[in-house]
From Swiss-Prot:
UniProt subunit comment: Interacts with the CDK1 protein kinase to form a serine/threonine kinase holoenzyme complex also known as maturation promoting factor (MPF). The cyclin subunit imparts substrate specificity to the complex.
Recorded superkingdom: Eukaryota
Protein name: G2/mitotic-specific cyclin-B
Source organism of this protein record: Patiria pectinifera (Starfish)
Lineage: Eukaryota, Metazoa, Echinodermata, Eleutherozoa, Asterozoa
GO biological process, one term: cell division
Coiled-coil parts of chain: none
Amino acid sequence: MQTACSGNLCGYQLMFSLSTVVTVCRSLRSRNRHWFLKLLGVRLTIAMRCALENISNVAKNNVQAAAKKEIKQKRGMTKSKATSSLQSVIGLHVEPVEKVQSPEPMDMSEVSNALEAFSQNILEMGVDDIDKDDHENPQLCSEYVNDIYLYMRHLEREFKVRTDYMAMQEITERMRTILIDWLVQVHLRFHLLQETLFLTIQILDRYLEGASVSKTKLQLVGVTSMLIAAYEEMYAEIGDFVYITDNAYSKAQIRAMECNILRKLDFNLGKPLCIHFLRRCSKAGGVDGHKHTLSKYIMELTLXEYSFVKYDXEIAAAALLSTRFWDEDMEWTKSLVHYSAYSEGHLGPIVQKMAVLSQQSHPSPNSRLDQEEDMASSKFMSDQQATQELKSIR
């Protein structure tokens, strides 16, 4: 069988296809199969597999691995244009860097001595130290409270709004008043904090100062300003603001306006609010909760008035001073002058404007001061009226 097979293979030069070779190999014995493949010029490589050591089913091709290794050795590194001009830094002189000593821990007795000296100085001026009893409460920061309020006044001057920005706008003062009346209703509907309302109007004025806004986009700017200002634990979703505008704007438009406002303000939203200074003035004056709440209401009345845009912390001091119209025992003491940084003569014109504004809002204020709902409804328009007014200016 071997002789006959070899004679046939040697006598013919045939071109076998792969399927034919496989078929012939299967029909031959192992010895004849090896001889048959040699005649065809095929190199048979059998990868041996260990029983226990090698558990992979992939046969390693030593020839391909050697070829790849040879290619890697021949391949050289070429410098790019960016690195060809670099010089070696080996051997250059490097100056030693001085070690920075960590500061020594501060002696708390020195801090206490400094606070006592400060208290003694202001007492000699006839000013009460309103922070002397707050040293045990770390949340009140009595050691730094004066520096904090100085920095807040610096921020107040840095982000001050121009008083003539409305002259460069298509909108008018009346449109701004209508928008703020509507925002007050939205603020009440969503049960937001009072700081949110003041911050909303502040963001609105600062954006209108630097951007040209059309009538059709005014409500969008207002509602987006409240969305940014409502940084609270419980806040309204964007869909709620879309609904409150009667679907006049979409979620995408509100998000786009949010980006525009933040870029225009350079993400600086930390301008102090007048309500922050009111707390300081109320503490310096030792006023009760009734006068403090009345002062906050007077400040709310000024939100819709464009003529009060130029005032910042003066509004808080003037609002507190305005309560003297209902309480003649209220005095503007040296402590109030020191902590508010305003004298009674400086606040006089602002107090007169607030008095006129209060009389316009409430013809007989003494009969309604204790009724918060009547006060709010008499000043601000209802939700339906505000919505109709806004639709009329679009």
